[in-house]
A protein has these predicted regions:
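Short, hydrophobic-biased segments on the C-terminal half of alpha helices
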Residues: 61-62
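Alpha-helical residues within the helix-turn-helix
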Residues: 48, 65-66
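N-terminal helix-turn-helix DNA-binding core of bacterial DNA-binding proteins
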Residues: 9-53, 75-87
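Amphipathic alpha-helical dimerization/coiled-coil segments
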Residues: 1-13, 34-35, 85-115
Length: 115
């Protein structure tokens, strides 16, 4: 799967994305999804891995999905959640767009991808 950087990132989308990960449990969930990469994780696996109650996890996954930082896909009777690397890279690009104030940055052109 190709990991493009979302170059059409708006301030509103940046705020929504940052708000989604500005909560400790959601940040931990998002980081676990990033580590899982393309294979993703089921809510059950996430709940067990992070020791989070399923009802609480459901709320956090809904918020991450709404923000665009995560997506879900039905696989049989399970939902598989994945980090949206294009959205994550778009957020990073938006935040660092003017980081070097005109000088060349050493940031990787391709951004972050699944391990």
């Amino acid at each position: 799967m190709e990991h493009n950087i979302n170059t059409d990132f708006s301030e509103e989308l940046a705020v929504r994305s940052l708000a989604a990960i500005a909560q400790p449990h959601r940040l931990r969930v998002f980081r676990a999804l990033v580590v899982a990469g393309e294979r993703g994780l089921t809510p059950g696996a996430l709940a067990e891995q992070l020791s989070v109650a399923p009802s609480s996890l459901s709320f956090h996954l809904k918020e991450l999905t709404y923000s665009g930082l995560a997506s879900s896909e039905a696989r049989g009777r399970n939902l598989i959640y994945r980090a949206n690397f294009a959205q994550m890279n778009g957020l990073l690009a938006y935040l660092t767009q003017h980081c070097c104030q005109g000088a060349a940055c050493e940031a990787a052109e391709e951004g972050c991808v699944a391990c």
